[in-house]
Amino acid sequence: MNEHGERDERHGDGERHGDGAAGTHGAAGARGEGGEGARDIAGLPTPAGRPDEATEAFLAHRSLLFTVAYELLGSAADAEDVLQETWLRWVGVDLAVVRDPRAYLVRMTTRQALNRLRTLRRRRESYVGPWLPEPLLTAPDVAEDVELAESVSMAMLLVLETLGPAERAVFVLRDVFGLEYGEIAEAVGKSQAAVRQIAHRARSHVAARRPRGAVSAAETRDALEAFRRAVETGDLQGLLDLLAPDVVLLTDGGGVVRAAQAPVVGAGRVAEVLGRIADTATLLPAQVNGRPALLLRLEGRLDTVVAVRLDEGLITGLYAVRNPEKLSRMQRETAVRR
């Protein structure tokens, strides 16, 4: 979906964020084999008898670690890379001195994610057009954990993008995953007093920017169904009734496919753009990032993932991810946990 409602063609090289292909990713995704001469799940030699213990501990918390990394980075491909780096460090740890593997692994993952986040921020400064998080196809039961579903939603991830790296890590670890201040202090390399101040500052920052009013999954689903009908039937007034006057449409093509290079602002302009795809688009419901969303298909192929932000019953944000390098996670469900 571009600003002119045209069908896209690939152009330019665009920025590549890594391989988010379906299935497990490198080291952190497969189970190793035990025994003498065994190799760890990265394919590197490890001492006899060691892989099973390390692997079991890692796999027990893998979905949690992925979710931590993803919420800090907004990129599944980069989150998988962080898990790879975490695994390689984990197999070098003396497990006999680790009292709490979960806390230890979360700290390791957070440190690796913060290192990568600083690099990603510089890369995103040169990103072609609006940058949006990489969407995840998630299971319906994610919505049952309301706080988790909100924290991985497209709208919340965009709010988290407005925090500094340390603020983002502290907020995610404290308010989403419920870590103690001492654990967070070790993860981010700051004192507990500093972490408490950062948490207060980050919480206020997020509260001022998060969606206004509690919105249930059912309300979002109903709004999206009305939105789908209006788009597919070309019902302009129906669209205008759903859109807030100051609604913002962001389209992420990453320089790989055509997309609006700047936000499209205002109900009239957004409805006009959406009206141009009525004859060619098929919109299907899906569960994306813990919330109801729509998949836009053209000629039978996935073209765009559409997520929304609702404030007080109206759509205030439309997030259309078109960059094909970000759509590979839509081929299978990704487990997110806390």
Where are these regions (language model features)?
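Active-site-adjacent scaffolding segments
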Residues: M1-E9, D19, E36-D81, E85-L224, ...
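Short, well-structured alpha-helical segments
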Residues: A79-L83, L240, A271
